[in-house]
C-alpha cells in the first residue's frame, strides 16, 4: 500500500479544517489528530507493507545555523512527531557520481542534515532505491554464529 504523499493529504485536511472553524489556529490541532489517526490506520494494516512518501523541507537551525532537512507538513506538531510513528524513515538523496551523472540513494541513518532511521538494523547508511530489495533485506533472518 502506498500513500503519495502524506504532505499533500495533510494540506487537504488542513484546508478542510480551516473552512470549518472560525479560528484557523484550531484547524492545526484537528489536522494533527486526523493525520495521526490516518497514518496509524494505514501503518497498522495487517498483512500489508505500507509505504508513505512526504515532501522534503529545508530548515535552518536557529541555534547552530546548520541546514537541516525534514518532512514538509503543515503545523509544527505534526512535522515533529511523524518520524516517531515509523520503524523506517529514509531520505531520497541525489548525488553526482565521478562522471557527473546523478545517482540516487536512500539514506537510512541520521547525519548532521537528515533525520533518518532504520530500526531493523539490517541496512547500510545508503541503500540503492529499490523498496523491494530493502524489504527483502529487512526480512532476511540474521546470521547466527555457530557455537
Regions found by a protein language model. Give the residues of each.
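P-loop NTPase motor domains
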Residues: 1-2, 8-13, 119, 130, ...
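P-loop NTPase motor core
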Residues: 3-80
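Conserved GTP-binding G-domain of TRAFAC-class P-loop NTPases and closely related GTPase folds
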Residues: 58-147
Amino acid at each position: 500500500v502506498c500513500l503519495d504523499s502524506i504532505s499533500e493529504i495533510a494540506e487537504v485536511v488542513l484546508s478542510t479544517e480551516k473552512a470549518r472553524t472560525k479560528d484557523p489556529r484550531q484547524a492545526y490541532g484537528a489536522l494533527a489528530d486526523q493525520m495521526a489517526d490516518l497514518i496509524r490506520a494505514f501503518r497498522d494494516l495487517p498483512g500489508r507493507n505500507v509505504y508513505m512518501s512526504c515532501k522534503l523541507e529545508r530548515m535552518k537551525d536557529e541555534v547552530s545555523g546548520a541546514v537541516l532537512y525534514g518532512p514538509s507538513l503543515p503545523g509544527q506538531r505534526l512535522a515533529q512527531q511523524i518520524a516517531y510513528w515509523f520503524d523506517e524513515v529514509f531520505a531520497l538523496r541525489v548525488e553526482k557520481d565521478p562522471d557527473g551523472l546523478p545517482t540516487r540513494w536512500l539514506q537510512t541513518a541520521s547525519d548532521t542534515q537528515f533525520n533518518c532511521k532504520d530500526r531493523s538494523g539490517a541496512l547500510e547508511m545508503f541503500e540503492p532505491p529499490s523498496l523491494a530489495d530493502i524489504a527483502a533485506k529487512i526480512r532476511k533472518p540474521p546470521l547466527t554464529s555457530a557455537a
